[in-house]
């Protein structure tokens, strides 16, 4: 029974550390990562784990997720209510504050085949880097509220200090089993923790002593360096520092992260620091320099060094009635302490005394520490008479030995006088620092280097003057730490008083609302009030002079966080009231991902709202919001429209039409004027697109005239995707083919809404996927680019922006039985092309009594067609012979011979036994090939071909075209392909597979399967694979070829090689050495 209770407690602890629950298959692994054991459900009498979990409803709550997975949640009890509250208050990026914010853009990289970094041409002296450091990405930050001052709260997760093992003396939970990864070096733990995060168990009261594990000798110097650094930090903060703030100062001073485990060791480092627990009982503690009672010792001249004053009276707690300590014992204690220059804990004195003198230390002397005060200095911790540190007294000249109490009192008076002088000196230094504060230069704000940083939009006066704040560890998080320190400094420092004289431009510390302390700069002054700008928030406010204080220099090291930017694409309309209002309503007070186009003093940016399922381009959205509504087509239900032009027909049957209206007439007039303008005026470089970005509207010359297009995706500096605003077509073009709209027509051109209207044929089933090629071709031949068609609107879907219409050709208008809708339903092509089902009776879909709408009834011909759809595809693939002959394959890519080096890039890595490399020298040719394939296949006619396994094709994967090997054909219309240049396996629609033309068969396939040499392992664990991937995937490395295994098919070639990371400044890291060391450490743990 005790075992069952123990398992229940541990299970609740595991579940409580996961706010969002744990899926059932992962529960055993999470339990074992914390306890070292599996859940013994069979020993407890249950056949399955789920049966055991359902037997303890007071511990586990089981629910089914939307995807059908079983998820386990913790059930709080009285004992663990406090823990549940703490977990609920965790500040993570998933917590909703106002709305959920995803600060990571889902927008794909403009050029996924673009590589960052370059391997070095030659290797330095090979060697294994034991202090391999790994950078970790900071967590996303959160929006917080500071009254009128907008703020950002970040959850900063400090990574472990590299290669710093921590020797713990503190107690641990009885059920906290030894974790395999706890004994690995920090460089390994960093990678493992990404897949197996360490969980914290707060639910156990029983404790046992953890064995004292001595760190390896190679780490001793590292620990000494950490201790010396902490001592330097404390020397700069004589008044103490909160332990929770120490990692921030450590990172700021030494540009390294402090291992969180070090924070638990301070009580055992009396020679480094003194720890005091505040009386309030909070979780945080204060940290002081060691031997704080002698603040002036290091500041005095060694030749004039004063003797140490006696301990303060409050530290001497004599024990009445205790026997006196023998003089010989005191002499031995003084001699013993002389060997401990950093002090000795009183509890350790008996053991050290006995080890040195082979004599037992008197027990009464330990109970009466005050009796030893004449031979040592006693520093009581938190007033506890049983917890103290003993320091040896410095030897004094015999003529100055203190013999009586009066002399001691006089010496105490000297100490008090020195302390007063020290405080006065500190005050004078603070005042002098204030006098020279105006000469201090605050460092400029550095634009983040990451691809899509997050920003908080504060306010704007126009679109060229938008005030933002960057969100992140080095920005909003650092600012919040600084503000907490400001609050502590100004609230608890009695010497700080409001400023008396002020002048414009002066920096201040302002006591704002909710007792917040913010940095500000004076804009203007009045008799009793001053107008300040909060330099970290970007807004202004009139405040009383009594709330303004001098800004201490220590708070000037962080850059002003409020900065300005310009919204790309809105420059010409930057002060338009409607535009400013639209931008303000969509952006102010919200966090966005930002694409920085130009990193100038005022950056040019594009904002993306990533809080929903799709990323929304805010710049483009605001531009469309201010279009002239009077120039937009307003279709009415049951209305008839003539002279309609069908401009585009999609493969799913969707139509785009142009309906005559005022906006279309004005657009055509403007485009004619633009044509004349370009014809008469010499085309200069100012009209070429120098900075393409998504959402930009420009001109493209097509079929002898200029058309409006919007950039939808930037592949590279040469190729991009555009959508024709007024026809609905999409294509890929070269950047050099686009032109800027002339300034004289720009404002009018932007005011005209898109003239392409999205339509669907009424009474035909919707959302059925692709139509057959024959059906789409028939529809295109019938109505595409016909300028005198007619439509009748039957329904408007405002949410989707779709009009449901009957479509008529000129000869059939207005007979509904001869509409395109009826013709396509009754056409003979559906009898032999059964990829799509259509309702033969139009009234059934629109009848009020038909609840299924356009869905065919079971047993109907349409339902039969739907069921036969996969078989039809499979049969057509097998029966039809390809009309395109297979060209010869390109030669295999060149690889270095055995024993030679080559520069490589690793696009994909599974484990050391299987990964993919690309020769670095050939990558620029692959980039050019990718661009050319995008441009070619985006404008070429889609061909319906019969595909075969193990043949080479071109396939479209996520808007880009790749050279692929077809590996398999599925029955649901999908095919499995292998990217021959990148080594990835993908599933694509069979319609996205096209013949690979001869011009794209000349470059050798770039992906080569590889195996890491120098390591022997038959089966790689998930953790080992993760470590390997983190070291090599998407990195440029140097390879030393051992063996090349040739094959007739270039995609079956294999190379066995060594990999070397040369990115570190002082050493080369051989990956096989690193993995061998990892396996060795793991085997020791197991």
From Swiss-Prot:
Residues 295-306 have a biased composition (Basic and acidic residues). Residues 849-1086 are annotated as: Interaction with CDK17. Residues 295-324, 844-866 are annotated as: Disordered. The modification Phosphoserine is found at residue 847. Residues 3-76, 222-291, 325-394 form the HTH OST-type domain. Found in a mRNP complex, at least composed of TDRD1, TDRD6, TDRD7 and DDX4. Found in a complex containing CABLES1, CDK16 and CDK17. Interacts with CABLES1, CDK17 and PIWIL1. Belongs to the TDRD7 family. This is Tudor domain-containing protein 7. It comes from Mus musculus (Mouse). The lineage of its organism: Eukaryota, Metazoa, Chordata, Craniata, Vertebrata.
């Amino acid at each position: 029974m005790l075992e069952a209770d123990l398992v229940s407690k541990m299970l609740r602890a595991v579940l409580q550390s996961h706010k969002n629950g744990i899926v059932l298959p992962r529960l055993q692994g999470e339990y074992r990562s914390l306890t070292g054991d599996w859940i013994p459900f069979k020993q407890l009498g249950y056949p399955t784990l789920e049966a055991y979990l359902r037997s303890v409803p007071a511990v586990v709550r089981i629910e089914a997720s939307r995807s059908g997975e079983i998820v386990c949640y913790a059930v709080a009890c009285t004992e663990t209510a406090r823990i549940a509250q703490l977990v609920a208050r965790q500040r993570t990026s998933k917590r909703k504050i106002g709305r959920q914010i995803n600060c990571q853009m889902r927008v794909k990289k403009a050029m996924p085949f673009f590589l960052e970094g370059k391997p070095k041409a030659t290797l330095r002296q090979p060697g294994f880097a034991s202090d391999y450091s790994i950078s970790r990405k900071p967590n996303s930050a959160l929006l917080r509220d500071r009254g009128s001052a907008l703020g950002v709260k970040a959850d900063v997760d400090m990574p472990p200090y590299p290669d710093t093992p921590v020797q713990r003396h503190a107690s641990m939970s009885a059920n906290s089993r030894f974790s395999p990864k706890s004994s690995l070096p920090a460089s390994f733990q960093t990678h493992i923790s990404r897949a197996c995060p360490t969980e914290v168990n707060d639910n156990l009261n029983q404790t046992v002593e953890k064995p004292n594990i001595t760190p390896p000798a190679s780490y001793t110097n590292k620990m000494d360096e950490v201790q010396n650094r902490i001592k330097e930090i404390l020397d700069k903060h004589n008044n103490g520092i909160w332990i929770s703030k120490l990692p921030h100062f450590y990172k700021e001073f030494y540009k390294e992260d402090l291992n969180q485990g070090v924070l638990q060791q301070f009580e055992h480092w009396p020679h480094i620091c003194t720890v005091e627990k505040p009386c309030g009982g909070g979780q945080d503690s204060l940290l002081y320099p060691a031997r704080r009672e002698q603040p002036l010792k290091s500041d005095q001249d060694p030749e004039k060094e004063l003797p140490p004053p006696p301990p303060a009276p409050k530290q001497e707690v004599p024990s009445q009635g205790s026997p006196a300590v023998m003089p010989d014992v005191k002499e031995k204690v003084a001699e013993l302490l002389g060997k401990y220059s950093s002090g000795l804990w009183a509890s350790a004195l008996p053991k050290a005394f006995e080890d040195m003198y082979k004599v037992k230390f008197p027990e009464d002397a330990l109970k009466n520490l005050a009796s030893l005060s004449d031979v040592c200095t006693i520093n009581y911790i938190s007033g506890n008479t049983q917890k103290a540190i003993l320091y040896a007294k410095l030897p004094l000249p015999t003529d100055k030995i203190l013999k009586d109490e009066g002399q001691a009192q006089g010496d105490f008076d000297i100490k008090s006088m020195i302390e007063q002088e020290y405080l006065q000196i500190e005050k004078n230094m603070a005042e002098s620092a204030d006098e020279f504060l105006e000469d201090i230069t605050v460092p400029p704000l550095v634009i983040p280097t990451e691809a899509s940083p997050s920003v908080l939009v504060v306010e704007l006066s126009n679109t060229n003057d938008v005030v933002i704040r960057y969100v992140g560890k080095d920005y909003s998080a650092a600012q919040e730490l600084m503000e907490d320190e400001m609050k502590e400094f100004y609230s608890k420092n009695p010497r700080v008083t409001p400023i008396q004289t002020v002048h414009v431009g002066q920096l201040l510390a302002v006591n704002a609302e909710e007792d917040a302390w913010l940095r500000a700069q004076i804009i203007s002054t009045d008799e009793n009030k001053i107008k300040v700008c909060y330099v970290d928030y970007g807004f202004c406010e009139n405040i009383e002079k009594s709330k303004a204080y001098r800004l201490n220099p220590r708070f000037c090291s962080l850059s002003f966080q409020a900065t300005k930017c310009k919204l790309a694409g809105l420059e010409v309309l930057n002060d338009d009231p409607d535009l400013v209002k639209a931008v303000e309503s969509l952006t102010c007070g919200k966090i966005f991902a930002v694409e920085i186009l130009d990193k100038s003093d005022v950056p040019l940016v594009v904002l993306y709202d990533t809080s929903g399922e799709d990323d929304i381009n805010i710049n483009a959205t605001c531009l469309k919001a201010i279009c002239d509504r009077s120039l937009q087509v307003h279709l009415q239900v049951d209305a008839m429209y003539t002279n309609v032009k069908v401009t585009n027909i999609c493969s799913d049957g969707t139509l785009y039409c142009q309906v005559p209206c005022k906006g279309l007439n004005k657009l055509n007039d403007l485009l004619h004027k633009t044509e004349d303008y370009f014809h008469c005026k010499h085309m200069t470089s100012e009209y070429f697109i120098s900075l393409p970005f998504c959402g930009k509207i420009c001109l493209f010359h097509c079929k002898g005239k200029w058309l409006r297009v919007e950039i939808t995706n930037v592949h590279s500096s040469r190729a991009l995707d555009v959508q024709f605003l007024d026809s609905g077509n999409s294509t890929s073009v070269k950047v050099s083919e686009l032109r800027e709209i002339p300034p004289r027509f720009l404002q009018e051109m932007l005011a005209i809404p898109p003239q392409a209207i999205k339509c669907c044929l009424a009474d035909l089933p919707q959302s059925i996927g692709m139509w057959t090629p024959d059906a789409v071709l028939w529809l295109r031949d019938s109505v595409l680019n016909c300028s005198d068609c007619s439509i009748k609107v039957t329904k408007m879907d405002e949410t989707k922006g779709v009009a449901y219409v009957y479509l008529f050709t000129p000869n059939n208008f207005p007979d509904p039985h001869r509409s395109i809708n009826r013709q396509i339903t009754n056409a003979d092509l559906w009898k032999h092309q059964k990829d799509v089902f259509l309702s033969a009776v139009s009234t059934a879909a629109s009848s009020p009594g038909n609840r299924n709408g356009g869905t065919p009834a079971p047993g109907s011909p349409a339902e039969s067609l739907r069921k036969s759809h996969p078989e039809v595809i499979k049969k057509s693939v097998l029966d039809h012979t390809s009309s395109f002959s297979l060209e010869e394959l390109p030669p295999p890519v060149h690889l270095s011979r055995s024993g030679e080096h080559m520069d490589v890039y690793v696009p994909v890595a599974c484990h050391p036994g299987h990964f993919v490399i690309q020769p670095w020298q050939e990558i620029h040719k692959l980039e050019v090939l990718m661009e050319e394939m995008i441009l070619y296949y985006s404008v070429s006619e889609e061909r319906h071909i019969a595909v075969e396994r193990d043949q080479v094709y071109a396939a479209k994967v996520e808007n880009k075209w790749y050279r692929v090997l077809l590996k398999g054909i599925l029955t649901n219309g999908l095919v499995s392909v292998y990217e021959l240049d990148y080594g990835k396996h993908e599933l694509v629609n069979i319609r996205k597979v096209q013949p690979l033309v001869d011009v794209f068969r000349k470059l050798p396939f770039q992906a080569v399967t590889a195996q890491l040499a120098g390591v022997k392992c038959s089966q790689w664990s998930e953790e080992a694979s993760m470590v390997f991937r983190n070291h090599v995937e998407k990195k440029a490395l140097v390879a030393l070829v051992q063996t090349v295994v040739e094959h007739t098919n270039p995609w079956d070639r294999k190379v066995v090689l060594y990999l070397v990371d040369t990115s570190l400044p002082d050493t080369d890291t051989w990956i096989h050495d690193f993995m061998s060391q990892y396996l060795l450490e793991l085997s020791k743990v197991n």
